[in-house]
């Protein structure tokens, strides 16, 4: 078993790392300033500037693996990207996680990544041309509407949103929440999951349908803050769908295939999120160590107190273990497929956030009262 990185893996990871350290990190204060000015729900200029720079450098659309193990509905519209494997991209995603807005710079931010995968695997040529191409070019944003306030949405078969066919249209009624990205003024299209046939088998009742956000009957009711943070300019919204009509051509893959699409979509996304979470943890650990070395108490640096030595050691152990598990899951997805890797994918979904929360919490404690302020970025990371 060889744990060394290949030349290609190192090449792409290092390109992303170097771009972030040279371009993104030096502009982080500019980002925070622009984010705080005026309307919360806006396009942030420095992000657009960095996107253009990354695109020109060819560090763009890194997330799309060359194959999912399933034939595509359409192969006439190609995806423009380097075709990194899940493992190769996982290493890049960790670097992006170190600064919260970095993934958007490379056009690799959720939910667009998962939605582009849906279009690529399951979309028709027309659906790809209309929606995937502008997403691929970084011109628009998108949303994925599955979770509902009235049911336990971790079980996707509970979804209650109604999708009733009337002639050449579907009429959609329901309420979604935690609809990430809807607050962005560039968000133009949503993939909505609902039920088209309540009499079908349990996992064949659901469908996924494309709903333009400017369609009559789409109403953004409110934004949902997370621990008091609005996560602007993307946000998480509650969206009401009231008698929304869309053409039948907007259904993806066909009626009754929604659960199947959801399963195919969520696997790669968990690799992305978990590896970015490792980046968040690494950043928190670095801030913690810097703080502990810069402060003294009882005649020695705080870092020299045994409790902090233990916490730092535990943080390093937990990060290394989590990274290995994530990379194993990514490797399995590339070599044996997402279905066989389901166990590992489920494990990282639990391990990565638990690991990061503990390290961020320790970093907050190391900063004292400053840890819960906005000065160090730890409260928002938590």
Roles of regions detected by a PLM:
Residues 104-126, 155:
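N-terminal glycine-rich flavin-associated loop
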Residues 84, 154-157, 182-187, 201-205, ...:
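Short glycine/proline-enriched turns and hinge-like loops at secondary-structure junctions
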Residues 138-147, 192:
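A short, Trp-centered hydrophobic/proline-enriched beta-strand micro-motif
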Residues 158, 216-245:
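Flexible, small-/acidic-enriched active-site or ligand-binding loops
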Residues 168-169, 173-221:
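A short core secondary-structure module
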Residues 152, 177-184, 268-272:
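Glycine-rich phosphate/pyrophosphate-binding beta-alpha loops
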Residues 153, 220, 250-255:
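Cytochrome P450 core scaffold surrounding the K-helix E-X-X-R motif
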Residues 1-100, 109, 122-127, 134-139, ...:
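Alpha-helical interface subdomain recognition
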């Amino acid at each position: 078993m060889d744990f060394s990185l290949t030349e290609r893996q190192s090449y792409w990871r290092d390109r992303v790392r170097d771009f972030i350290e040279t371009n993104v990190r030096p502009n982080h204060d500019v980002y925070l300033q622009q984010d705080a000015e005026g309307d919360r729900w806006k396009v942030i200029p420095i992000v657009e500037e960095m996107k253009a720079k990354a695109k020109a450098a060819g560090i763009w659309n890194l997330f799309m693996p060359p194959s999912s193990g399933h034939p595509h509905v359409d192969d006439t519209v190609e995806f423009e990207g380097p075709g990194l494997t899940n493992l190769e991209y996982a290493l890049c995603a960790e670097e992006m996680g170190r600064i919260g807005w970095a993934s958007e710079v490379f056009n690799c931010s959720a939910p667009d990544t998962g939605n582009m995968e849906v279009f690529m695997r399951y979309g028709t040529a027309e659906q790809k041309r209309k929606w995937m191409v502008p997403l691929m070019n970084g011109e628009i944003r998108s949303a994925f509407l599955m979770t509902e306030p009235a049911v336990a949405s971790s079980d996707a078969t509970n979804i209650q949103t109604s999708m009733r066919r009337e002639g050449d249209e579907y009429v959609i009624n329901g309420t979604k929440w935690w609809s990430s990205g809807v607050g962005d003024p560039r968000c133009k299209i949503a993939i909505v999951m609902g039920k088209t046939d309540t009499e079908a088998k349990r996992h064949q009742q659901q469908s996924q349908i494309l709903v333009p956000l400017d369609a009559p009957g789409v109403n953004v009711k409110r934004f949902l803050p997370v621990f008091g943070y609005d996560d602007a300019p993307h946000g998480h919204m509650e969206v009401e769908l009231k008698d929304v009509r869309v053409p039948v051509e907007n259904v993806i893959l066909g009626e009754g295939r929604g659960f199947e699409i959801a399963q195919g979509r969520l696997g790669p996304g968990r690799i992305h999120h978990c590896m970015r979470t490792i980046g968040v943890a690494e950043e928190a650990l670095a801030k913690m160590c810097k703080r502990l070395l810069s402060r003294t108490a009882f005649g020695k640096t705080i870092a020299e107190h045994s409790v902090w030595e233990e916490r730092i050691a535990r943080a390093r152990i937990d990060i290394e273990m989590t990274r290995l598990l994530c990379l194993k899951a990514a490797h399995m997805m590339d070599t044996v497929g997402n279905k066989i890797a389901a166990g590992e994918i489920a494990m990282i979904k639990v391990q990565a956030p638990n690991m990061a929360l503990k390290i961020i919490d320790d970093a907050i404690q190391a900063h004292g009262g400053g840890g819960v302020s906005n000065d160090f970025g730890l409260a928002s990371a938590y």
